[in-house]
């Protein structure tokens, strides 16, 4: 019968614990099936449609349970399930009163069935015939023989089949329990499957348009039930006893809802009985709830060591003889069953992916060894641990002991220890020794840890200082190298500029520098003339200037055409024409100076020696370039213009050879 209203209450209070699954989801799973419940279903379901009687052989023996058990087992195996059938043993003593009640109900149903047959009421016949069904021992033995010939394992429980199935799931020998009795959850089955038998043999859940639709089954998870109801296993057992079970009577007026509220408030049946209203809720005089609790917690089941589950090959010849000769089954039907059985056994040999990928909860010895090695090789963490109050007290105690040992000496300590050991008992000696060893070990470990930490800190500080010194040296070397590179670059630039504008080199810039030097020398000579010749020199110098201006005017008039031609020609031709003109002017100026000079030609301070300076040549060259009468202001302007040209040439003039005519024409004559 199970627990009254349990599945309905679970569906309402803990809906996550119940779910519908397909039979394909159980592929490769071992399912423990309540055999007596299955046989009861077969005898009720498989009947003659005319008289609603059982299928029988020639001798009148019932064969409904054999045909139903064989067809269902083959269908489960075809879907990949591995069934294990568990048969009931002797009923427990607590169930005696329940069995008496069932016997009385069966007698009443037989009386009603006789009346329905006399009246010809088919609906009443069908209803009452199901209540009169009873599975006999002979039928159980016939079912056991059939399953052994098919190679399917069976287990004979010493007591209840539901309790044995539940413990198979606890032993991890089965995945779930297939039964209609909800008391399998109270025995502790992990997963309960309902409607497996009905759905596996009927077509009621198939869709006409889609015949390949899988069967829908109901699965109840005990762990989710306890979470949803927020109960412990002991509280859940007391709750089921209050709802109504096969092992004791129930308290009148208490259903599943009130039982749940009372358990949540008082946690156990004893407190409920003490605090319950006896007038409202009548407790039975023989309320054996404690014995029922024990039977649920410690049922009479086979231990794990005594359980043997063997999957054997089917005995085909013996199976044929058993079905055809003993129970008059059709031979074609039997051969069809056997062929299906052989194919189904190949399907059951397939394994699930869960079997290949199982979770390992224990660490292997290799992992443990590797972890210990890593912990030993790991460097100590930076910084010191903050000592706690206990550590400080231990350190103080260690220091005191050391001071006392140094003061008294090792010999006195030994004598005191001997006297103390003689006075104490053996138990006291052991306790003291253990405490001393622990304190000594701890103190030594603390000292070692402190020394290790200090050494590590010193080594780290040294390494940091070395790294800082190395970084400073590297920075100094880099700065020195940078300064050297800068000095080398400056020197190279100075050399480059000196090469470009060196007076000794044959370049236009060199000639400009020479001319500037000559101008500076001429200015010095002009400044020194008054000191050498006095006022007379000034007169002569002015006369010389006048003569030079007259010569310049004449030459400008006579040679204007030639100079214009020279300007239009190349730069090199202009240089040659100017040189000839300078030579002529030089001769004329020399004559005038000779005639007017009162000094001797041989005197070292004579004007004839000074006239050989490049002063006149420089002046004449400037006259040719400017073509204007030269005065002191004009000379200053010329000097300023030369300085401006000098600055411009520093930035504009490239380096090129003096005699450009001798250089061959190429695409790249010379790069600047």
UniProtKB/Swiss-Prot annotation:
Region: Disordered, residue numbers: 371-610
Domain of life: Eukaryota
Positions that bind Mg(2+) 1: 34, 88, 160, 162
Entry-linked InterPro entries: 5-3_exonuclease (IPR002421), 5-3_exonuclease_C_sf (IPR036279), Flap_endonuc (IPR023426), HhH2 (IPR008918), PIN-like_dom_sf (IPR029060), XPG-I_dom (IPR006086), XPG/Rad2 (IPR006084), XPG_CS (IPR019974)
Region (I-domain): 124-266
Alphabetical UniProt keywords: DNA damage, DNA repair, DNA replication, Endonuclease, Exonuclease, Hydrolase, Magnesium, Metal-binding, Mitochondrion, Nuclease, Nucleus, Phosphoprotein
Single GO molecular function: 5'-flap endonuclease activity
Start-end of Basic and acidic residues biased regions: 413-493, 502-526, 535-548, 587-603
Cofactor: Mg(2+)
Residues that, per the record, bind Mg(2+) 2: 181, 183, 246
EC assignment: 3.1.-.-
Compartments in which it is found: Nucleus, Nucleolus; Nucleus, Nucleoplasm; Mitochondrion
Subunit structure: Interacts with PCNA1 and PCNA2. Three molecules of FEN1 bind to one PCNA trimer with each molecule binding to one PCNA monomer. PCNA stimulates the nuclease activity without altering cleavage specificity.
Annotated family: Belongs to the XPG/RAD2 endonuclease family. FEN1 subfamily.
Name of the protein: Flap endonuclease 1
Organism: Plasmodium falciparum (isolate 3D7)
Gene expressing this chain: FEN1
